[in-house]
Amino acid sequence: MGKKYKESTKLIDRKTLYTPLEAMELALKTAKANFDETIELSIKLGVDPRHADQQVRGAVVLPHGTGKKVRVLVLAKGDRIKEAEDAGADYVGAEEYVEKIQKENWFDFDVVVATPDMMGVVGRLGRILGPKGLMPNPKSGTVTFDVAKAIQEIKAGKVEYRVDKTSIVHVPIGKKSFEVQKLLDNFRVLMEAIIKAKPSAAKGQYLKSVAVSSTMGPGIKINSVKVLE
């Protein structure tokens, strides 16, 4: 552990479950790196992701965005190409970008949006994009004919959440440069979405634990009973 990390841990009581407000304040105090650290939530859920009926996945637009400039690749054809360009997509095309990803290992983008009629071609990228969490998916709104709306939401701060194989959801909610209230607003919107996404097959306690941390800082535990207060 580095000197700054050790200093940060002294500000936190590991046994305490903080209120969301206290946790956001501490997350900013413990973000001591000399760059604009990302503030991220880690939510342990009472689900078994090995079962299809206990998957937790979706997307939500954070009111204040994530503080990160998101590069959007749109795979479309026909009239949708100009529509995507006008909406502010960073890259727009079809088979040429699929080949570029396959042959050149090109990944200068953060989100991929595809129209439904392109999914036959995009499917060839499943093994490449899937492990990176970049594969377009209807549940997250990235497979759609309304590419303009999808791009606008992504640029406005839309984030995807998905439970991993350890039953944890990791989602960025802002930057060290954010005010506490903006982090709190983003936190509440995200938590509301995840609570609403609870699978009917999930039994027992749904929110096992909630923690927030900066890129280089320690985790700060949040009282899961008070997440929407």
From Swiss-Prot:
Entry-linked PANTHER family: 54S RIBOSOMAL PROTEIN L1, MITOCHONDRIAL (PTHR36427), LARGE RIBOSOMAL SUBUNIT PROTEIN UL1M (PTHR36427:SF3)
GO molecular function, one term: rRNA binding
Chain's role: Binds directly to 23S rRNA. The L1 stalk is quite mobile in the ribosome, and is involved in E site tRNA release. Protein L1 is also a translational repressor protein, it controls the translation of the L11 operon by binding to its mRNA.
Family: Belongs to the universal ribosomal protein uL1 family.
Keyword set, alphabetical order: Repressor, Ribonucleoprotein, Ribosomal protein, RNA-binding, rRNA-binding, Translation regulation, tRNA-binding
Subunit note: Part of the 50S ribosomal subunit.
InterPro entries: Ribosom_uL1_bac-type (IPR005878), Ribosomal_uL1 (IPR002143), Ribosomal_uL1-like (IPR023674), Ribosomal_uL1/biogenesis (IPR028364), Ribosomal_uL1_3-a/b-sand (IPR016095), Ribosomal_uL1_CS (IPR023673)
Pfam family, one: Ribosomal_L1
Chain ranges passing through the membrane: none
GO CC terms: large ribosomal subunit
Protein name, per record: Large ribosomal subunit protein uL1
Protein origin, superkingdom: Bacteria
GO biological process, one term: translation
